[in-house]
Amino acid sequence: MSGSTITPWVVGNWKMNPMRANANQLIEEFKQLLQQNQIADENCHVGVAPVSIALTTVQAQLQDAARTVYTVAQDVSRVAGTGAYTGEVSAELLKDSQINFVLVGHSERRDIFGDNVEILKAKLQNALNAGMTVIYCVGESLEQREQGQAEQVVLQQICDIAPVVTAEQWQNQVVIAYEPIWAIGTGKTASPQDAQAMHAKIREGLCQLTPAGSNIAILYGGSVKAENAVELAACPDINGALVGGASLNAASFYQIVQAFAQSK
């Protein structure tokens, strides 16, 4: 079942970049592009995910943008509330700062920092219960793809979280981002045909898990660039993009937003 009627999302994941002066300049340049070439809110949801210490600064900078641009946290604690947890930022603390969106399950969190299924379920559940919208990342390694396990791995990652997501949360608070691990930061991109095939399988799996399955946005994240955005955006089950390196250039990021806003 196609998700072509879903309003697309484009989210820029800045990762551990850039320095403050460059971040300020990046936001101002992006705002100027939005002012000159406005894209209606209803045509595309747009977000940026800066480092945690810049969340409220970026949020304040975006207040006078020509359209809504959400500020997205890159991660959240597996511990809820407040307490003696040095270095942690809970979903409740994010919400208290009016940060309503968060990434959970990015492959760099899984691979570098050891976020396993139980940790990710706790992070997801805390964020959802705090009222946040979660962009939940799934994806396979090159080895898993070459062994023919890509679909099995990705669908299992989604099934793993099903016990902690309510029907209402699936409907209103969950976005899925498919990020083939082998395409992140490598310059390699799944062909639009391969990406669409995986997105269609994810859509099928979501529809089996929840009645909301046909309404959940599925983003593609794997070296999305201005040069390939139009072709990716034309795929019926690709409902947006989780953009890495290209989001650190205002013009490139704007072109990706424009591609998805004009595609649906």
Curated annotation (Swiss-Prot):
Record key words, sorted: Cytoplasm, Gluconeogenesis, Glycolysis, Isomerase
Broad class of where this protein is predominantly found: cytoplasm
SUPFAM superfamilies: Triosephosphate isomerase (TIM)
Active site: 106 (electrophile), 179 (proton acceptor)
Similarity remark: Belongs to the triosephosphate isomerase family.
Functional summary from the UniProt entry: Involved in the gluconeogenesis. Catalyzes stereospecifically the conversion of dihydroxyacetone phosphate (DHAP) to D-glyceraldehyde-3-phosphate (G3P).
Protein name: Triosephosphate isomerase
EC assignment: 5.3.1.1
Subcellular location: Cytoplasm
The keyword Isomerase belongs to this UniProt entry's keyword annotation: yes
Record-linked InterPro entries: Aldolase_TIM, TIM_sf, TrioseP_Isoase_bac/euk, Triosephosphate_isomerase, Triosephosphate_isomerase_AS
Subunit structure: Homodimer.
Catalytic activity annotation: D-glyceraldehyde 3-phosphate = dihydroxyacetone phosphate
Gene Ontology CC terms: cytosol
Signal peptide: none
Residues binding substrate, per UniProt: 13-15, 185, 223, 244-245
Pathway assignment: Carbohydrate biosynthesis; gluconeogenesis; Carbohydrate degradation; glycolysis; D-glyceraldehyde 3-phosphate from glycerone phosphate: step 1/1
GO biological process, one term: glyceraldehyde-3-phosphate biosynthetic process
GO molecular function, one term: triose-phosphate isomerase activity
CDD domains documented for this protein: TIM (cd00311)
Cytoplasm among keywords: yes
